[in-house]
Regions:
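Short alpha-helix capping/helix-loop boundary micro-motifs
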Residues: 382-387
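Electropositive polyanion-binding surfaces
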Residues: 1-381, 394-421
């Protein structure tokens, strides 16, 4: 896994580095990106362009046919990309598209090997208990003064990159932990007891078997629950409610593992252009592999505390900003669809009404006063129990877009009918 060596150009405590730490991460909006580092780096000398020599920090892994990393090495290097393939092109190659295969004939065997390895790694991760959430989020684009929400189809080519990045992140984190080096880990603590118990009750009310211990839930408990519901209508909502029951992943100088990935040890190594923790650990790794372990300990032991805390804070702030801007663009998108009717799924139940999600992942609100009858909210069952009709999370309904509120960034629906299963 070859990653651009950004630290060669962004020196520790330099003005560029201080600004990167202050930003913490790149921020992505539908119409623009606020980069962590200048575009001259991200789009220029640190971009692994086709046919150009680039400096890298690489994690070299030798993996056997069972998906086990037999040995690994972290090295500095220079690479020259033969081709810059897109996900679509890789998908076409694997699907046997003759024109694409002919165009990239020199890397066809390599791409096929990557696909073969990914198919080995997937069941290995599943056996560990990785919680593979399938939460659909609207991908909003703003181009040529037009808002679009394309169908974000997940291809196998995406899984290849994801599998290799996760493996590299684990391998690098395990290397640093074994050396007891100062480091920034990516941690994800297990769900707290109260939220796990609430989620367990929700799953049981859906008719699912959920017998895990709320005070000591394991990744495979959640994974098995998802697997048991993958062919049911409530699968999408189960994913979303499961996500809400989990803690937020964050950065820490202390390793406590990663619950969602069922990883004993994890970090972010693969994106130093857009995440400060990656940049920080690249520096530490370079000190160590060049025989300067003592200098790394002296220089970075205190700094990793600051880097982890600031990066976690900035990540949360960036995510909030992205959500707010996305919500505004969704509201603008739905403002042009007043009066249109859609099939939706109830995604939230409150004392004040229902939230419903459309097939393209846009959510709207149905106020309780627009529903017929009187209602009692039963939160532990995610249920709005009425004198005429009751509504619970996961049920399918027919809705109409009534109005939008730009100030609150909210779309209001009218409930037309409950769809009987």
């Amino acid at each position: 896994m070859h990653i651009a060596d950004v630290t060669h150009y962004v020196k520790y405590r330099s003005p560029l580095d201080k600004e990167a730490l202050s930003r913490g991460t790149s921020v992505y909006f539908p119409d623009r990106v606020l980069p962590m580092l200048p575009r001259a780096l991200s789009n220029g000398i640190c971009s692994l362009n086709e046919g150009e020599d680039r400096l890298t920090l690489s994690c070299l892994m030798r993996i056997d046919k069972k998906g086990v990393v037999k040995d690994s090495e972290i090295v500095e290097g220079v690479i020259r990309s033969t081709h810059r393939l897109t996900y679509t092109e890789v998908t076409k190659m694997l699907d046997g598209d003759e024109q694409t295969i002919a165009k990239y004939e020199d890397v066809q065997d390599m791409v096929c090997l990557f696909a073969e390895l990914t198919k080995i790694l997937k069941p290995v991760r599943a056996k560990k208990g990785t919680v593979s959430l399938d939460v659909k989020e609207a991908k909003i684009l703003f181009e040529n003064d037009e808002i679009t929400i394309p169908d974000a189809k997940r291809e196998f080519s995406h899984e290849i990159i994801e599998a290799f990045m996760v493996l590299a992140n684990e391998t690098v984190a395990e290397y640093a932990e074994a050396l007891e080096a100062p480091f920034v880990y990516r941690i994800h603590e297990k769900p707290n007891e109260e939220k796990a118990a609430t989620f367990r009750t929700f799953a049981q009310n859906l008719g699912l078997t959920a017998r895990f211990q709320a005070d000591d839930v394991k990744p495979y408990d959640y994974q098995n629950l998802l697997k048991s519901a993958e062919d049911l209508p409530v699968y999408a909502v189960l994913n979303r409610v499961m996500l809400r029951s989990m803690q937020k992943a964050r950065y820490s100088p202390e390793n406590v593992g990663h619950f969602g990935l069922a990883s004993r040890c994890y970090c972010h190594f693969t994106s130093p252009i857009r995440r400060y923790p990656d940049l920080c650990i690249h520096r530490i790794l370079k000190e160590i592999i060049n025989g300067r372990y003592g200098e790394a300990v002296e220089k970075y032991t205190a700094f990793v505390e600051e880097a982890a805390q600031k990066s976690s804070d900035r990540e949360r702030t960036a995510a909030e900003a992205e959500r707010e801007v996305d919500a505004l663009y969704m509201t603008m998108y739905m403002s042009e669809r007043i009066g249109e009717e859609y099939e939706a799924v109830i995604s939230g139940v409150t004392p004040y009404g229902l939230f419903a999600e459309l097939p393209f992942a846009v959510e709207g609100f149905i106020p309780i006063e627009t529903l017929e009858g009187n209602f009692e909210h039963i939160p532990e069952r995610f249920l709005l129990k009425g004198t005429r009709e009751s509504y619970s999370i996961g049920e399918r309904i027919q809705v109409q877009v009534v109005e939008v509120d730009f100030y609150r960034r909210r779309t209001q629906f009218a409930l037309l009918a409950k769809i009987k299963e």
